[in-house]
Regions:
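Alpha-helix C-terminal capping/helix-coil junction sites
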Residues: 28, 87-88
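Membrane-embedded glycan transfer/ligation machinery
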Residues: 34, 77-80, 99, 168-172
Length: 183
């Protein structure tokens, strides 16, 4: 069943999920969210694929089914499971250097940073030394190249410093180098 609402909610859903659609629509109509997408697939079947609202707070640019967003922390659980699976399959070794999988990462004096050091936020790679714009977050190759080529902010294993903006790129690129697939 395909649905279109004059106000904001668009998409398709299995009729068993009509309540999900109604909650999504209400959320947008009540201005609880400026814009959003929500999709659920089971065994390749679309159960819910909803989107709507706006891409900006000024409500000038509508959210469409192809709107790309940076999901930040929501990917951490998925990434952790992928890393655990790669370790279990002996495709990734916590004791090996990141550069063994991602050779360019060795630039800037990072040749001896271990996978476990990167995963535990002790690599000193919590930011970009070169100023970047928020729109750069959508340019994967650009931001991972910057990270690969820069020096760390401190010596690896010297201290723990949360990598909130870079960890997704760092571990995501490591996974990509091991599996030839993006997260």
């Amino acid at each position: 069943m395909t649905t279109e609402n004059e106000i904001t909610a668009l998409g398709e859903f299995n009729k068993k999920f009509e309540n999900t659609y109604e909650l999504f629509k209400k959320n947008l109509e009540n201005d609880e969210e400026v814009g959003a997408s929500f999709a659920v697939y089971q065994n390749g079947e679309v159960l819910v694929n909803l989107y709507g609202g706006y891409r900006d707070r000024d409500k000038k640019n509508k959210w469409d089914q192809n709107t790309i967003v940076n999901i930040h922390s929501t990917s951490k659980g998925i990434v952790a499971m992928i890393v655990a699976k790669l370790i279990d399959e002996n495709k990734l070794d916590l004791e090996k250097n990141v550069a063994d999988y991602w050779p360019e990462f060795a630039n800037g004096g990072k040749e001896s940073i271990k996978v476990k050091t990167l995963l535990s936020h002790q690599a000193g790679m919590y930011g970009w030394r070169q100023p970047i714009d928020e729109t750069d977050f959508y340019k994967w190759d650009y931001v991972v190249d910057l990270l690969a080529n820069q020096e760390p902010y401190h010596k690896a294993d010297e201290k723990i410093c949360y990598h909130p903006k870079t960890i997704g790129f760092l571990v995501g690129e490591l996974i990509k180098r091991v599996t030839n697939k993006s997260v």
